[in-house]
């Protein structure tokens, strides 16, 4: 893309949550690559956090953006969930939904789909309330800091979740590798990292504005996770991609990894 890498200042000034949600999360039943990507992530998360899956007390979601779908599956398994994002607007959008404020984004279709995966599409309202109760805080995050949640200091978590965010925050493979190490510092030994990464994505559109990414290969992501001190328990490489006019990625990688117990 033209110009330099779009860093935090550009996100703070120009990233509009409603444009982003309209582009990537209009889950209205009509078929689209974006809807299929959302389904893919919800299915992976259901398998990861559903019956017999990961559970614990605390989960930190890094780079939540203005979305809540990524913690729908986990709210039955974790009682203390932290959402986080770099930009004020995204955090405000999250708070609107959590507090049921007028004009909050309607996540009902995604919540209903998540409940269908659990075999009970009728309990979607209960699911929303369970999630609202489980989310204890919405914090600012910066994955380039040694403590990505600074100045907040939280107890080490059982799980760190980050979907479709790290590749947008990092300008290079080295920056991505360093950021993964920062995320690892938030986890207990033996805790889990759960992440979806869009592959070979140079940039993506939000409204009429283009935001840059680091274009990662599956092997680079895999090695970065290993080098950050994790053992990979699951790696799913899918050809799932967005509409080329929105985000010209080439597949995605879903990973569940366990932080090594220590030296």
UniProtKB/Swiss-Prot annotation:
GO terms for biological process: amine metabolic process; methylation; response to toxic substance. Keywords: Cytoplasm, Detoxification, Methyltransferase, S-adenosyl-L-methionine, Transferase. The keyword Transferase applies. Its EC number is 2.1.1.49, 2.1.1.96. It is an enzyme of class 2 (transferase). Functions as a thioether S-methyltransferase and is active with a variety of thioethers and the corresponding selenium and tellurium compounds, including 3-methylthiopropionaldehyde, dimethyl selenide, dimethyl telluride, 2-methylthioethylamine, 2-methylthioethanol, methyl-n-propyl sulfide and diethyl sulfide. Plays an important role in the detoxification of selenium compounds. Catalyzes the N-methylation of tryptamine and structurally related compounds. Belongs to the class I-like SAM-binding methyltransferase superfamily. NNMT/PNMT/TEMT family. This is Indolethylamine N-methyltransferase. The lineage of its organism: Eukaryota, Metazoa, Chordata, Craniata, Vertebrata. The gene is INMT.
């Amino acid at each position: 893309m033209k110009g330099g890498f779009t860093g935090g200042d550009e996100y703070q000034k120009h990233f509009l949550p409603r444009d982003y949600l309209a582009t990537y999360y209009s889950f209205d039943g009509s078929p689209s690559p974006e809807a299929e990507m959302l389904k893919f992530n919800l299915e992976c998360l259901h398998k990861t956090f559903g019956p017999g899956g990961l559970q614990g007390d605390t989960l930190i979601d890094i780079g939540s953006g203005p979305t809540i779908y990524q913690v729908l599956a986990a709210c039955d398994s974790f009682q203390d969930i932290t959402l986080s994002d770099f930009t004020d607007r995204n955090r405000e959008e999250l708070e609107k939904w959590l507090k049921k404020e007028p004009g909050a984004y309607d996540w009902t279709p995604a919540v209903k789909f998540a409940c269908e995966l659990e075999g009970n599409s009728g309990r979607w309202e209960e699911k929303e309330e369970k999630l609202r109760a489980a989310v204890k805080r919405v914090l600012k995050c910066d994955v380039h800091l040694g403590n990505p949640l600074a100045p907040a200091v939280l107890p080490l978590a059982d799980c760190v979740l980050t979907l479709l965010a790290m590749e947008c925050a990092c300008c290079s493979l080295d920056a991505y590798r360093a950021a993964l190490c920062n995320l690892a510092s938030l986890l207990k030994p033996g805790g889990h990292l759960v992440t979806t990464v869009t592959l070979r994505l140079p940039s993506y559109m939000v409204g009429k504005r283009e935001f840059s990414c680091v274009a990662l290969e599956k092997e680079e992501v895999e090695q970065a996770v290993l080098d950050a001190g994790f053992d990979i328990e699951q790696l799913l490489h899918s050809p799932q991609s967005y509409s080329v006019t929105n985000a010209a990625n080439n597949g995605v990688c879903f990973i569940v990894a366990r932080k090594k117990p220590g030296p």
